[in-house]
């Protein structure tokens, strides 16, 4: 998809999700937007585009609405396997988003209302059994960071980032020291892991990437 198409999808679905989250009393919705992006492939999957199910919601035993049988992949511990299953069908995106919140409005997912941030929301989803993918939490968090989706959360996002450092710095260690943050290798690794998905090897490229975010005031705290 083009950058403009990605932006258009987020601008369309995010306000719908935020409005429904407000109605239901959820502060965090960035992870839900990320779910719509990942599960529905930016609204282009058949399930999302035709059936307005952006979240891969299966019917289960309690669903009494319309359904469609489709192929899907699941990870039961030995890698992805292809299966067929019945999925919920909605008439429009508003119903689809409301359906997601209906789905999580059970005792099983009760902890989601108390998630402090997008990462904890993703961790709760995985722990509650929403998805089988081992990388589900990382995938969602990477998506939130990539598209700055945390700006849609009902939280003080300014407290999520380190303050800007001087633009003249060429060393991440010196930059962290300047703003009074622990610059040890162990803490830098924690910082990197929150902001990037690859393994931190203390390379010059990785340190430069962290420094660039810090200069912009966009380096997330661990």
Identify the function of each model-found stretch:
Residues 24, 128, 147, 179, ...:
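Residues at alpha-helix termini
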């Amino acid at each position: 998809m083009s950058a403009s198409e990605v932006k258009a999808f987020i601008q369309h679905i995010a306000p719908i999700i935020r409005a429904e989250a407000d109605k239901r009393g959820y502060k965090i919705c960035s992870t839900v937007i990320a779910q719509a992006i990942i599960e529905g492939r930016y609204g282009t999957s058949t399930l999302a585009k035709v059936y307005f199910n952006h979240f891969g919601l299966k019917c289960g035993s309690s669903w009494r609405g319309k359904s469609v049988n489709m192929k899907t992949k699941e990870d039961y511990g030995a890698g992805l396997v292809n299966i067929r299953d019945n999925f919920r069908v909605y008439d429009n995106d508003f119903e689809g988003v409301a359906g997601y919140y209906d789905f999580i409005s059970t005792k099983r997912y009760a902890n989601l209302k108390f998630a402090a941030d997008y990462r904890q929301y993703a961790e709760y989803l995985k722990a509650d059994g929403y998805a089988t993918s081992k990388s589900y939490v990382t995938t969602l968090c990477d998506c939130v960071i990539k598209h700055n989706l945390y700006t849609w959360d009902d939280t003080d996002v300014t407290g999520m980032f380190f303050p800007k450092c001087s633009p003249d710095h060429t060393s991440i260690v010196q930059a962290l020291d300047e703003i009074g943050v622990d610059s040890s290798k162990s803490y830098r690794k924690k910082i990197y892991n929150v902001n990037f998905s690859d393994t931190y090897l203390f390379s010059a490229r990785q340190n430069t990437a962290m420094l660039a975010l810090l200069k912009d005031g966009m380096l997330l705290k661990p």
